[in-house]
């Protein structure tokens, strides 16, 4: 299985109320995939949000990366993704953080560790068949 790598630039950044909608399918042999909200275009940009469904360990990990160092991991409850199934994830910018909604259910509200106004791109990668990334 070949890994996906897709980046959507956000030259205006994100603001309160910005919604990012990611749609795709989890392949049958999927291990992990990620959605990163990056604070730049460069390879080692800080990540205001690292959203990382890990089907191989049945968990979803949230984190940030600042100056090349990962922060403290947070985990959601259960894994709302299934191999071979389509999914829709909404990441909504709120005053407190990034609210993730998977399907119709709020999953986890990840509190800001750096200003959301620093976000300049959305990166999706790993074991995923990406259908679309839309910004509202």
From Swiss-Prot:
GO terms for cellular component: cornified envelope; cytoplasm; extracellular region; nucleus. A beta-D-galactoside binds at residues 70-76. Residues 6-136 form the Galectin domain. One of its GO terms (biological process) is apoptotic process. Its main location: cytoplasm. InterPro entries: ConA-like_dom_sf, Galectin-like, Galectin_CRD. It is found in: Cytoplasm; Nucleus; Secreted. SMART domains: Gal-bind_lectin (SM00908), GLECT (SM00276). Keywords: Apoptosis, Cytoplasm, Lectin, Nucleus, Secreted. Pfam families: Gal-bind_lectin. Could be involved in cell-cell and/or cell-matrix interactions necessary for normal growth control. Pro-apoptotic protein that functions intracellularly upstream of JNK activation and cytochrome c release. Monomer. This is Galectin-7. It comes from Rattus norvegicus (Rat). The gene is Lgals7.
């Amino acid at each position: 299985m070949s890994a996906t790598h897709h980046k959507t630039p956000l030259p205006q950044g994100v603001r309160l109320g910005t919604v990012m909608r990611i749609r795709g399918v989890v392949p049958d042999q999927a291990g992990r995939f990620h959605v990163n909200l990056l604070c730049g275009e460069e390879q080692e940009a800080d990540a205001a949000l690292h959203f990382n469904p890990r089907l191989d360990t049945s968990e979803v990990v949230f984190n940030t990366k600042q100056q090349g160092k990962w922060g403290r991991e947070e985990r959601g409850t259960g894994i709302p993704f299934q191999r071979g199934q389509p999914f829709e994830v909404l990441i909504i910018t709120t005053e407190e953080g990034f609210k993730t909604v998977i399907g119709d259910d709020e999953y986890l509200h990840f509190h800001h560790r750096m200003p959301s106004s620093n976000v300049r791109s959305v990166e999706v990668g790993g074991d995923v068949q990406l259908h679309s990334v839309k910004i509202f």
